[in-house]
Amino acid sequence: MEKEILLEVNHLSKKFGDQTILKDISLTLRKSEVIVIIGPSGCGKSTFLRCLNGLESVSGGDIILEGQKISDGSMPHAELCQKIGMVFQSYDLFPHMTVMENITLAPLQVQHRNKEEVFKEAIKMLSRIGLSDKENAYPRELSGGQKQRIAMIRALIMKPDIMLFDEVTASLDPEMVREVLDVVMELAKEGMTMVIVSHEMQFARAVADRILFFDKGLIAEEGTPDAIFDNPQNPRTKQFLHSFTYEN
């Protein structure tokens, strides 16, 4: 039995002035499904994620979340961000706040949850990712990998239905990439519904239920990880994947 559809995208388009960034994008995302989007820089991957959680308006088409159309702006953005969480490649932690203050700000001020319960949950989540000793640290005292894991917790503590990850390892040193990807992999095992933009091909293959290859604002090809990586049908997909291997 197929799981319920959480998100539907129907013929989505996005323009900036005369430039078309996304062209006729359609997909469905089911509960606990992990979709990984791959593709060259500038093909619309990040813009697509920003459309999903309302950071960018759409030029055409519909986005439907749990049966409710959200692409028309009818859902308040604060409410939408509680349902669809997002982690960016640039961390975006508040530099003047401690780790604990960064994590607990939104659930306390936006969701008006019980302070004691929120702090207890934050401590538990910090312990889970091995950063329980950093609750009183400031962002400047953390490594890039630690900042990114804190950014993930800050989004997850809002209890979103869907998580979006936009190239979360792009600005990290190679040694820090694994510690961040391990957290995402663990979320997948626990059934978190996710859409992930990534250039980490081995990770994409391991974590995804479905791979989408974006090119020039279109879904040029989609399929299971095995289908995309072992037997791509689109010549452009083959060319892109070949760029990740070096043959002398």
Residues covered by each model-derived region:
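ABC family nucleotide-binding domain
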Residues: E4-K216, A220-P225
